[in-house]
Curated annotation (Swiss-Prot):
Cytochrome P450 monooxygenase; part of the gene cluster A that mediates the biosynthesis of botcinic acid and its botcinin derivatives, acetate-derived polyketides that contribute to virulence when combined with the sesquiterpene botrydial. Botcinic acid and its derivatives have been shown to induce chlorosis and necrosis during host plant infection, but also have antifungal activities. Two polyketide synthases, BOA6 and BOA9, are involved in the biosynthesis of botcinins. CDD domains: CYP503A1-like. GO terms for biological process: secondary metabolic process. Pathway: Polyketide biosynthesis. PROSITE patterns: CYTOCHROME_P450. It is found in: Membrane. Induction: Expression of the botcinic acid clusters genes BOA1-13 and BOA17 is coregulated by BCG1 during both in vitro and in planta growth. Its EC number is 1.-.-.-. The gene is BOA4. It comes from the Eukaryota. Glycans are attached at residue 115. The keyword Transmembrane applies. It comes from Botryotinia fuckeliana (strain B05.10) (Noble rot fungus). This is Cytochrome P450 monooxygenase BOA4.
Length: 495
């Protein structure tokens, strides 16, 4: 029998344990804070955090061959000139890390964002399995695209104004989801809500933590309303995926089981001991959503706005589609490869509207001396001014002019047949990064966007609102985003 005195002793012991734990917790982060050092790197700081695009343009022009510091919110970022690209992409992971930069930028140790095991499983599944299976996935992508347009984008007889980005985001979520989680989950309203808002909530959660003094961030993170939303997304994603994975494991026990070529199976194969962990699988799917949905929607949204602002390109792209893809024909990878004008238009739209102003983002895991003596300190963050490269007159002729078929014409040069494509990376094209950690999903995204653009051009007329110019993109830290309130007019295509 337990007496009240015993309960008091237990309560006191528990209180002492909690107090001791809090002291250890506070001392640990005090030690971390006191041992943090300012970046020891001799380079000019260009601009301020309120307008990073202008800072990058000015820094790129003022320091064409030397590094400069960009005053990004969480920590300064070393912006390296393009001459270092081969050295940077060749550094081993014990010296430099893409994933650690990614995690730090979004305060992953508080948001549980992109842990190493999750990042590895997702990267392998997307870079290897998904890329090799795009041809097989196109049938499902086309079917879901047709259904998404039918349910999300009206087809009125007369001009109708619509707010573009939210519609595109939902359609991309459905089409991507058809490949990532299958049907019917890809059309589940709660799943669409989770996958489309996770990115925003992770960003806001990281920002909210950053706004606090470093000593109080761990405590704030425990009670942050922003991070509570992120944790709820993880819980909800796990609940949705648990029965799907359990069913797959039951099927795998059958003697006649044949592995489906889908993301569920690839994640099982690439997750090691975490294969049956629904929470892990939920985090992985949300990481895919983070990397894919808004970037794909941004590229497609910008292309639609550019087409609406420059209607002369619409008919040219329709003619190219008609010449290579008869009505009621299954889209194939080979057919999409033939749409060179569409590919060029998308790449030019991407050049003029860079979603990521800085790419090749890395964190130095060790101090490295480059070939010219430049020292990159351990713990520093670096990147390259991808958005500014696209406007460099030394690289592109008349860079401030929109030429939708710029890259199609460049591909007509001898030996350039397979260069200058949307998915191509290199010193003059860093939108998707470059090297080992270039965007692994860019091949899938390219095919997805083209499939959706075909559906749009075949069945809709669209234009800017009368008397308006192309809506400007909005600045957001090191990104440019499509204005979520931007509107266009649409109607059923007149044939």
């Amino acid at each position: 029998m337990i007496h009240f005195a015993d309960l008091g002793a237990i309560s006191l012991a528990n209180s002492n344990t909690v107090i001791a734990g809090c002291i250890v917790f506070a001392l640990y982060y005090l030690f971390q804070f006191l041992n943090s050092k300012k970046l020891n790197f001799d380079a000019p700081v260009i601009g301020d955090a309120s307008d990073l695009r202008s800072a990058l343009i000015n820094g790129y022009n003022q320091c064409p061959n030397t590094p400069f510091l960009l005053p990004t919110a969480a920590h300064p970022t070393i912006i390296l000139p393009i001459k270092y690209i081969d050295e940077i992409k060749s550094l081993p992971p014990d010296k430099i890390s893409f994933l650690e930069e990614f995690r730090d930028r979004y305060f992953g140790h508080y948001t549980a964002f992109a842990n190493n095991t999750e990042g590895d499983a997702v990267t392998t599944s997307v870079k290897v399995d998904l890329t090799q299976s795009i041809a097989r996935a196109l049938e499902n992508m086309q079917a879901e695209t047709e259904l998404a347009f039918a349910t999300e984008l009206p087809k009125p007889k007369d001009w109708m104004s619509v707010t573009l980005y939210p519609i595109i985001l939902r359609m991309v979520a459905k089409v991507s989801g058809r490949v990532m989680v299958g049907e019917p989950l890809c059309r589940n309203e709660k799943w669409i809500q989770i996958s489309t808002t996770y990115t925003r909530d992770t960003f806001l959660g990281g920002r909210a933590v950053w706004a606090r003094h470093p000593l109080f961030r761990p405590i704030y993170a425990l009670y942050s309303p922003e991070l509570k939303k992120v944790r709820q997304h993880y819980t909800d994603a796990a609940e949705f995926l648990r029965p799907i994975f359990n069913q797959r494991f039951k099927e795998m026990e059958r003697d006649d089981f044949e592995k489906p070529q889908d993301m569920i199976q690839w994640m099982i194969d690439n997750s090691g001991n975490n294969a049956k962990d629904a929470t892990f699988q939920g985090r992985c799917q949300l990481l895919i959503s983070f990397a894919a949905l808004h970037t794909t929607s941004g590229l497609l949204g910008n292309a639609m706005l550019d087409l609406a602002a420059r209607p002369k390109y619409i008919e040219a792209l329709r003619e190219e589609i008609a010449a290579n893809l008869p009505e009621n024909t299954q889209i194939t990878k080979q057919i999409l490869t033939k749409l060179r004008k569409m590919d060029s238009f998308l790449k030019e739209s991407q050049r003029m509207n860079p979603l990521n102003l800085v790419t090749m983002n890395r964190k130095m895991m060790d101090t490295v001396q480059l070939s010219d003596g430049t020292i990159l300190p351990k713990g520093s963050f670096l990147g390259m001014a991808a958005g500014s490269i696209g406007f460099d007159p030394r690289i592109f002729e008349n860079p401030d002019e929109f030429d939708g078929f710029r890259f199609e014409k460049l591909r007509q040069q001898e030996g350039a047949e397979n260069k200058f494509q949307l998915v191509t990376t290199g010193k003059d094209s860093l939108a998707f990064g470059h090297g080992t950690h270039s965007c692994p999903g860019r091949f899938f995204a390219s095919n997805e966007i083209k499939t959706m653009l075909i559906e749009l051009l075949r069945n809709y007329d669209f234009q800017l609102l009368p008397g308006t110019e192309r809506p400007k993109n909005l600045k957001s830290d090191m990104s440019l985003v499509v204005d979520p309130t931007a509107q266009i007019q649409i109607k059923e295509r007149c044939r």
